[in-house]
C-alpha cells in the first residue's frame, strides 16, 4: 500500500515536466525543504526487477530514476504522434492534413496525455504542483520496459555544477523528427538530453527562425510575416517552402544565365579571331591575284613576241637552195670529174708496169719500123700516162758526152737502137692503152688499176686487136 502511494506521488510530477527543464526536475524531486520526495524512504519502496538489473546493474541512482520515469513513458504499442509544436522547421515529410493531428485540444493536452498516468485505476485528474489541465484516463495497458534509458553519468556534473550547466546550451541539436524517425531506444540512450527534451520540451528548446535577405524580401513582397521562433504552422511552412523554391529557381536561372553569358563571350572571342584571320587571308588573296595578273600580262607579251618572230613566211628560193645543197653534198663523192683531178696529181702514187715474157719474145722476132728523128726529143705524147715516161727512161741510156754536137748525134742513134730493141709490140702496147680506155668509156685513176683489173689473157687479146686496127 505504501509502495502504491509513493508510486502515485512520484508519478504525478511527470505531468508537470512539460514546461520544466531537467535541472528544475531534479530540484523539484530532491530538494531537502520543498522536495516531493523528502519524506519518502527510497531504499524500501523500490524493488528492482531482474530485467532492470540487467539494464543498469551498477548504479543505484540509475535504478531510482528509471523507476521514476518508467511509469511516465508512453505505451510502445500506442501510435507515435509528432507534436504540433515541434521544432522541425521546414518539413520535408509527406504532406500532412488535419487527419494526421492526434485527437486532443492542443499541444498542451497532447503532452499531458502522453505523460500523465494515474497511480490507481479509477483515479481522477493527475495531481500537479503547477497549473495544468486535467488528464483524461487512458485505457489500462500492460506496462512494458521503458524504451528511454537516461544515463546519469552525464548528469553527475549537473548536480555538482548546476549553475555552469544551466547556462551552457545542449550539446545535441537533434530535432523531434529525427528522434521519431530513429525508432529505437538505443538512439535515445545515446542522446539522453535529447530524450529529456522529447519528454518535456521547455523554454530552452525553442529555436529561432533564421531568414536570409532574399527570403525576407520575398516575404515582404508576398505580404506574409513569419514568426521568429519555431515551430511554424502548416500555412507558414508552405509559404516558406514557396519562397525558398523561388530563391532556388532564381539562383539556378542566374547560374544558367552566367553559363550562357560565358559561352556567348567565348563565341564572340572566337568570332573576332576568325574575323581577323579571314581579313588576313583576304589580303593574301588580293596580293596573289595581283601577282597572277602581272604573270598573265608577261605571258601575253611573250606570246606576242613569239608570234611576230614566227609569222614571217619562208621564201621558196631558200628552200630550193637548201635542197640542192643537200643533194650536192650527198652525190659529190660519187662524181668522176672531181676524182680525175685528184688522180692527175703526180705525188699520189707511181705506177709500175710489168711486161709479159711472151711479149718480149715476140718483140725480139719482130722488126720495128724506122723512126724518123725529128727536131723534138722523143718522149711521151700528150695525154699519155706517167708510166710511159718511166718505161722510156728504162730503155733509153744516153751517155754523157763532152761535145754537144756529138751529143745530138749519139742521142739520135741511141734512140733508134732502143726503138729497135723494144719491139713493135711493146710500143703498140703503150700507144694502144689510152685509146682503148677512151673507147671503152672507162676512166680510172691510173694505169695500175687498169692492169690489176684486166686479166692477162684479155690484155693480150686487146693489144692484138689494137695492132690489127692500126
UniProtKB/Swiss-Prot annotation:
<dbReference type="GO" id="GO:0046982">
    <property type="term" value="F:protein heterodimerization activity"/>
</dbReference>
<dbReference type="GO" id="GO:0005783">
    <property type="term" value="C:endoplasmic reticulum"/>
</dbReference>
<feature type="topological domain" description="Cytoplasmic">
    <location>
        <begin position="1"/>
        <end position="319"/>
    </location>
</feature>
<keyword id="KW-0539">Nucleus</keyword>
<feature type="domain" description="bZIP">
    <location>
        <begin position="239"/>
        <end position="302"/>
    </location>
</feature>
<comment type="similarity">
    <text>Belongs to the bZIP family. ATF subfamily.</text>
</comment>
<protein>
    <recommendedName>
        <fullName>Cyclic AMP-responsive element-binding protein 3-like protein 3</fullName>
    </recommendedName>
</protein>
<comment type="function">
    <text>Transcription factor that may act during endoplasmic reticulum stress by activating unfolded protein response target genes. Activated in response to cAMP stimulation. Binds the cAMP response element (CRE). Activates transcription through box-B element and CRE. Seems to function synergistically with ATF6. In acute inflammatory response, may activate expression of acute phase response (APR) genes. May be involved in growth suppression. Regulates FGF21 transcription.</text>
</comment>
<dbReference type="GO" id="GO:0000978">
    <property type="term" value="F:RNA polymerase II cis-regulatory region sequence-specific DNA binding"/>
</dbReference>
<feature type="region of interest" description="Leucine-zipper">
    <location>
        <begin position="281"/>
        <end position="302"/>
    </location>
</feature>
<keyword id="KW-0804">Transcription</keyword>
<keyword id="KW-0812">Transmembrane</keyword>
<dbReference type="InterPro" id="IPR051381">
    <property type="entry name" value="CREB_ATF_subfamily"/>
</dbReference>
<keyword id="KW-0472">Membrane</keyword>
<feature type="region of interest" description="Disordered">
    <location>
        <begin position="59"/>
        <end position="145"/>
    </location>
</feature>
<dbReference type="InterPro" id="IPR004827">
    <property type="entry name" value="bZIP"/>
</dbReference>
<keyword id="KW-0238">DNA-binding</keyword>
<dbReference type="GO" id="GO:0001228">
    <property type="term" value="F:DNA-binding transcription activator activity, RNA polymerase II-specific"/>
</dbReference>
<feature type="glycosylation site" description="N-linked (GlcNAc...) asparagine">
    <location>
        <position position="410"/>
    </location>
</feature>
<keyword id="KW-0325">Glycoprotein</keyword>
<keyword id="KW-0010">Activator</keyword>
<dbReference type="GO" id="GO:0000981">
    <property type="term" value="F:DNA-binding transcription factor activity, RNA polymerase II-specific"/>
</dbReference>
<dbReference type="GO" id="GO:0006986">
    <property type="term" value="P:response to unfolded protein"/>
</dbReference>
<dbReference type="GO" id="GO:0000977">
    <property type="term" value="F:RNA polymerase II transcription regulatory region sequence-specific DNA binding"/>
</dbReference>
<dbReference type="GO" id="GO:0045944">
    <property type="term" value="P:positive regulation of transcription by RNA polymerase II"/>
</dbReference>
<dbReference type="GO" id="GO:0006357">
    <property type="term" value="P:regulation of transcription by RNA polymerase II"/>
</dbReference>
<dbReference type="GO" id="GO:0005634">
    <property type="term" value="C:nucleus"/>
</dbReference>
<comment type="subunit">
    <text>Binds DNA as a dimer. May form homodimers. Interacts with ATF6. Interacts with SYNV1/HRD1; this interaction leads to CREB3L3 ubiquitination and proteasomal degradation.</text>
</comment>
<dbReference type="GO" id="GO:0000976">
    <property type="term" value="F:transcription cis-regulatory region binding"/>
</dbReference>
<dbReference type="GO" id="GO:0034976">
    <property type="term" value="P:response to endoplasmic reticulum stress"/>
</dbReference>
<keyword id="KW-0805">Transcription regulation</keyword>
<feature type="transmembrane region" description="Helical; Signal-anchor for type II membrane protein">
    <location>
        <begin position="320"/>
        <end position="340"/>
    </location>
</feature>
<keyword id="KW-0735">Signal-anchor</keyword>
<keyword id="KW-0256">Endoplasmic reticulum</keyword>
<dbReference type="GO" id="GO:0005789">
    <property type="term" value="C:endoplasmic reticulum membrane"/>
</dbReference>
<dbReference type="Pfam" id="PF00170">
    <property type="entry name" value="bZIP_1"/>
</dbReference>
<dbReference type="InterPro" id="IPR046347">
    <property type="entry name" value="bZIP_sf"/>
</dbReference>
<dbReference type="GO" id="GO:0016020">
    <property type="term" value="C:membrane"/>
</dbReference>
<feature type="cross-link" description="Glycyl lysine isopeptide (Lys-Gly) (interchain with G-Cter in ubiquitin)">
    <location>
        <position position="290"/>
    </location>
</feature>
<keyword id="KW-1017">Isopeptide bond</keyword>
<keyword id="KW-0834">Unfolded protein response</keyword>
<feature type="topological domain" description="Lumenal">
    <location>
        <begin position="341"/>
        <end position="470"/>
    </location>
</feature>
Amino acid at each position: 500500500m505504501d509502495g502504491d502511494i509513493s508510486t502515485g506521488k512520484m508519478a504525478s510530477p511527470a505531468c508537470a515536466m512539460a514546461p520544466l527543464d531537467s535541472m528544475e526536475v531534479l530540484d523539484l524531486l530532491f530538494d531537502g525543504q520543498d522536495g516531493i520526495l523528502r519524506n519518502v524512504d527510497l531504499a524500501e519502496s523500490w524493488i528492482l526487477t531482474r530485467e532492470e538489473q540487467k539494464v543498469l546493474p551498477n548504479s543505484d541512482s540509475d535504478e531510482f530514476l528509471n523507476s521514476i520515469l518508467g511509469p511516465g513513458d508512453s505505451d510502445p504499442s500506442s501510435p507515435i504522434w509528432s507534436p504540433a509544436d515541434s521544432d522541425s522547421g521546414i518539413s520535408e515529410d509527406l504532406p500532412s492534413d488535419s487527419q494526421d493531428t492526434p485527437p486532443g485540444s492542443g499541444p498542451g493536452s497532447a503532452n499531458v496525455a502522453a505523460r500523465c498516468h494515474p497511480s490507481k485505476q479509477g483515479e481522477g485528474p493527475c495531481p500537479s504542483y503547477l497549473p495544468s489541465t486535467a488528464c483524461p484516463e487512458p485505457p489500462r495497458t500492460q506496462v512494458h520496459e521503458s524504451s528511454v534509458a537516461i544515463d546519469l553519468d552525464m548528469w553527475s556534473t549537473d548536480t555538482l555544477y548546476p549553475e555552469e550547466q544551466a547556462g551552457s546550451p545542449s550539446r545535441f541539436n537533434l530535432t523531434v523528427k529525427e528522434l521519431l524517425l530513429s525508432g529505437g531506444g538505443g538512439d535515445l540512450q545515446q542522446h539522453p538530453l535529447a530524450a529529456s527534451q522529447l519528454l518535456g520540451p521547455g523554454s530552452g528548446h525553442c529555436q529561432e527562425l533564421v531568414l536570409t535577405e532574399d527570403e525576407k524580401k520575398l516575404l515582404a513582397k508576398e505580404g506574409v510575416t513569419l514568426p521568429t521562433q519555431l515551430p511554424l504552422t502548416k500555412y507558414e511552412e508552405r509559404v516558406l517552402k514557396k519562397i525558398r523554391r523561388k530563391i532556388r529557381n532564381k539562383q539556378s536561372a542566374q547560374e544558367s544565365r552566367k553559363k550562357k553569358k560565358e559561352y556567348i563571350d567565348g563565341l564572340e572571342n572566337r568570332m573576332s579571331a576568325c574575323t581577323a584571320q579571314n581579313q588576313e587571308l583576304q589580303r593574301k588573296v588580293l596580293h596573289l591575284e595581283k601577282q597572277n595578273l602581272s604573270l598573265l600580262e608577261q605571258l601575253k607579251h611573250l606570246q606576242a613576241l613569239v608570234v611576230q618572230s614566227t609569222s614571217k613566211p619562208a621564201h621558196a628560193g631558200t628552200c630550193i637552195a637548201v635542197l640542192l645543197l643537200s643533194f650536192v653534198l650527198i652525190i659529190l663523192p660519187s662524181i668522176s670529174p672531181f676524182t680525175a683531178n685528184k688522180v692527175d696529181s703526180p705525188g699520189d702514187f707511181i705506177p709500175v708496169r710489168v711486161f709479159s715474157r711472151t711479149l718480149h719474145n715476140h718483140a725480139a722476132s719482130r722488126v720495128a719500123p724506122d723512126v724518123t728523128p725529128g727536131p723534138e726529143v722523143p718522149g711521151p705524147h700528150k695525154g699519155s700516162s706517167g708510166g710511159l715516161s718511166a718505161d722510156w727512161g728504162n730503155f733509153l741510156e744516153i751517155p754523157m758526152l763532152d761535145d754537144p754536137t756529138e751529143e745530138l748525134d749519139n742521142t739520135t742513134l741511141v734512140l733508134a737502137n732502143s726503138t729497135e730493141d723494144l719491139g713493135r709490140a711493146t710500143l703498140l702496147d703503150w700507144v694502144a692503152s689510152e685509146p682503148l680506155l677512151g673507147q671503152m668509156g672507162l676512166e680510172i685513176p691510173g694505169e695500175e688499176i687498169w692492169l690489176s683489173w684486166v686479166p692477162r689473157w684479155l690484155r693480150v687479146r686487146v693489144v692484138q686487136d689494137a695492132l690489127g686496127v692500126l
